[in-house]
Amino acid sequence: MLKELVLILMAGVLVNNYVLQQFLGICPFLGVSKKVNQAAGMGFAVTFVMLCATAVTYPLFTYALVPLKLEYLQTIVFILVIAALVQFVEIVLKKFIPALHKSLGVYLPLITTNCAVLGVTINNITDGYNFIESMISSLGVGLGFLLAMVLFAGVRSRIDNCPAPKAFKGIPITLIAASIVALAFYGFAGVVENLLA
């Protein structure tokens, strides 16, 4: 059981990284990754929302939607739960960490529409995970999002300080760098299974 939980966690962080392998959550990945501290703040906020969303949506789906045969409402119910959680996070950040709230700007409310958050809640159910496995999966996906954001912010800060051909400045060099980071994560595909075998 512990081995399976570690595998789920490592898969979420490295192998099935939602940003770099499944291309979910690209908007904040490209928009908030200019500074490492902003990227870390966004990564922690998204991880927190993912964990809270899973903690609420899993029992809601299992004990309310399924018994009432309302599974078709899954997406809309999950979006409403995520929106409420994001509002809660925004209120907490504004009250206790106003500098981070200001630096995240418009990207903080956009966590509501971050497809990575919705994706992890839906994928946990479609993958047949129980509650503990769903929470571990959400933690892994959130940490993977955080890792990708912070690594890419570091890469991006280096790119911004280096001369690049005029045609590559801005978005083109950013997308090229993102693809190289994604290729680096692709190298983890067989590592996790071999470590736990």
Locations of the language-model features?
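Juxtamembrane transmembrane-helix termini in multi-pass membrane transport proteins
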Residues: 8-45
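C-terminal ends of transmembrane helices
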Residues: 24-38, 86-100, 152-163
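Interfacial loop-to-transmembrane junctions
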Residues: 157-176
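Small-residue-rich segments of transmembrane alpha-helices in multi-pass membrane proteins
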Residues: 45-55, 105-120, 170-182
